[in-house]
């Protein structure tokens, strides 16, 4: 875009505060504080900068919960970031964002992912180009219509002040992005996804990103509070591990954030904290017709209008 005026310091302050707010809320819900791992890359390394990882493993509610903040810079955008905008290939960059994935212990609690980020591409003698990206999406093992509707309504409410066209646009983008092409199935019930967003200018784009970040806790926590105490057994845990396998497949094969981190020389522990602690694969497994497991495929991981 032509307007190159932006304020990285304000974005950084917001993102660090968002990470802290979410980590505190999850720790209070679980009863276990999230550990803090602050990391830094040296000026001579391929990727410079640092960040903070907040992590919980083996909790009462969350089997694994990871929330990462990073602010890194490099000399050339990796291919995953410039594939859709080849004119940016080879530019230097700064990328800062918060990304989280939560894997609850109870199979009736859905996995969730959220990310908000800003990227700046630079080239000597030319104005910097910035954009925002992010979104959130819900991946149930056992679907509940109330949960999907609540999650989508909260996403819509976060976007509506910035234009009624944004929710349907970002919802469709999410359905198309979180799709396992080799399985011909969606990863979950979707949510919202956006990238390369800078159309309204810095201030309005930043406000929209903040609205998405601020909507995460009200979108997700009520679902966990409804489902975390539901009884479950070995059958449900087995299906949870099987569905987590799909999560692994998507993140390692398709996810642009994972590819960006690995291609740019990012911190592997932070990049792969999105992986579930336990996952499995079964050869040519099919759910029993009419079962709750079959309903996930027929009623939930298909494109639907949830609002």
UniProtKB/Swiss-Prot annotation:
InterPro entries: Coprogen_oxidase_aer, Coprogen_oxidase_aer_sf, Coprogen_oxidase_CS. Residues 247-282 are annotated as: Important for dimerization. It is found in: Cytoplasm. GO terms for molecular function: coproporphyrinogen oxidase activity; metal ion binding; protein homodimerization activity. Pathway: Porphyrin-containing compound metabolism; protoporphyrin-IX biosynthesis; protoporphyrinogen-IX from coproporphyrinogen-III (O2 route): step 1/1. Its cofactor is a divalent metal cation. A divalent metal cation binds at residues 103, 113, 152, 182. Keywords: Cytoplasm, Heme biosynthesis, Metal-binding, Oxidoreductase, Porphyrin biosynthesis. GO terms for cellular component: cytoplasm. Its EC number is 1.3.3.3. It is an enzyme of class 1 (oxidoreductase). PROSITE patterns: COPROGEN_OXIDASE (PS01021). The active site is at residue 113. GO terms for biological process: protoporphyrinogen IX biosynthetic process. It catalyses: coproporphyrinogen III + O2 + 2 H(+) = protoporphyrinogen IX + 2 CO2 + 2 H2O. Substrate binds at residues 99, 115-117, 265-267. The record marks 182 as: Important for dimerization. Its main location: cytoplasm. Pfam families: Coprogen_oxidas (PF01218). Homodimer. Belongs to the aerobic coproporphyrinogen-III oxidase family. HAMAP family: Coprogen_oxidas. Involved in the heme biosynthesis. Catalyzes the aerobic oxidative decarboxylation of propionate groups of rings A and B of coproporphyrinogen-III to yield the vinyl groups in protoporphyrinogen-IX. This is Oxygen-dependent coproporphyrinogen-III oxidase. It comes from Burkholderia multivorans (strain ATCC 17616 / 249). The gene is hemF.
């Amino acid at each position: 875009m032509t307007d190159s005026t932006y304020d990285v310091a304000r974005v950084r302050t917001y993102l660090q505060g968002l990470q802290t707010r979410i980590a505190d809320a999850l720790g209070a819900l679980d009863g276990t504080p999230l550990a803090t791992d602050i990391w830094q890359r040296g000026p001579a390394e391929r990727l410079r900068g640092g960040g903070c990882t907040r992590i919980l493993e083996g909790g009462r509610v969350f089997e694994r919960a990871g929330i990462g903040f990073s602010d890194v810079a490099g000399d050339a955008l990796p291919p995953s970031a410039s594939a859709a905008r080849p004119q940016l290939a080879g530019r230097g960059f700064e990328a800062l964002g918060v990304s989280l994935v939560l894997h609850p212990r109870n199979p009736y609690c859905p996995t969730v992912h959220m990310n908000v980020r800003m990227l700046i591409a630079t080239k000597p003698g030319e104005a910097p180009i910035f954009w925002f990206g992010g979104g959130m999406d819900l991946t149930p093992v056992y679907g509940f219509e109330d949960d999907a509707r609540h999650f989508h309504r909260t996403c819509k409410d976060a976007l509506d002040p910035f234009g009624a066209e944004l929710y349907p646009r970002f919802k469709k983008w999410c359905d198309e992005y979180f799709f396992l092409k080799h399985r011909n199935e969606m990863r979950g019930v979707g949510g919202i996804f956006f990238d390369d967003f800078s159309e309204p200018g810095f201030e309005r784009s930043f406000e929209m990103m903040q609205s998405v970040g601020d909507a995460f806790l009200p979108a997700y926590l009520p679902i966990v509070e409804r489902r975390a105490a539901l009884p479950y057994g070995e059958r449900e845990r087995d299906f949870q591990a099987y569905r987590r396998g799909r999560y692994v497949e998507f993140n390692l094969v398709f996810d642009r954030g994972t590819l960006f981190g690995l291609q740019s020389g990012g911190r592997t522990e932070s990049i792969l904290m999105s992986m579930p602690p336990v996952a499995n694969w079964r050869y040519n497994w099919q759910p029993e017709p009419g079962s709750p497991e079959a309903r996930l495929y027929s009623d939930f991981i298909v494109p639907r209008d949830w609002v």
